[in-house]
Amino acid sequence: MISRIDHVSIAVKDQEKAAHFFQDILGAVAGTCAADPVTRYFWQLFSLGDLSRLEIISPTGPGSFLDGFLKSREAGVHHITLQTPDIKKAMAHLEAHGVPFFGYNEYPEGVWTEIFIHPRDAFGVLIQIAQFESDDWLSEHVKFPAGTRWQVEKTQTGATLTFAHPGGGKVALEMDRKALQQLKESLENALA
C-alpha cells in the first residue's frame, strides 16, 4: 500500500529564513515550488543527501489553512507524506480497516492525488497519502533525463555507478576494480 516516506512538511511563518537555513546551512537542494491561491500558502521542496525530502510551507496571507497551526508557534512539523502507487487501493485498504480519511483531491492532469488521515486517528500525526511520480517534483540537476536508469563513469580506481533512485533522482555508488569484477561476474551469472 505504501511505497515510502516521501517528505516531512514543516510549516513556517518566514519562508525566506527557512529556505536560507535548509539550503545555505544544511546544504539542501531547492526543488519544485508553487503558491496555492485557494488555501493561501506557498510550498517548496528541498532534497537532502540521499534525496530525502523536506517541504517548507508558509501562509501567503490572511485566511491561510496554516493560520491555526502557526497561531502559537513560529514553525513546526505539519505532516508527513507517504507515497502510494495506487490511491484508490490505499483508500479501500484504509476503509477495510476502519481508518477514516478525508480531503480526497486530484490535481489537474493527475500529477498528484491525495488523502489525509487526521492526527486523532494516526497517533498525533497528520498523514498525507499521495499518488504521484517522484521525479516530477525534483530539481533537474538531481535526476536523470527521461528513460535513463543508470550511468557508468570510469574513475582512476574503478568506476562510479549511478542509478535512478526509486524515490526519484539518482544515487551513486563508488566501486573499485575488484568490486566491478565481482559485479560483472554476478551479472553474467544472472544472464546465463
Regions found by a protein language model. Name each.
Residues 5, 22, 51-57, 77-84, ...:
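Short, structured motif recognition centered on aromatic/hydrophobic residues
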Residues 11, 83, 173:
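Active-site-adjacent beta-strand anchor residues
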Residues 61-66, 156-160:
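Short amphipathic beta-strand starts and helix->beta connectors
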Residues 62-109:
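Charged surface patches that recognize polyanionic ligands
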Residues 2-4, 71-77, 165-168:
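Short glycine-enriched loop/turn motifs at secondary-structure junctions
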Residues 1-2, 10-53, 89-112, 117, ...:
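Core segments of cupin and vicinal oxygen chelate
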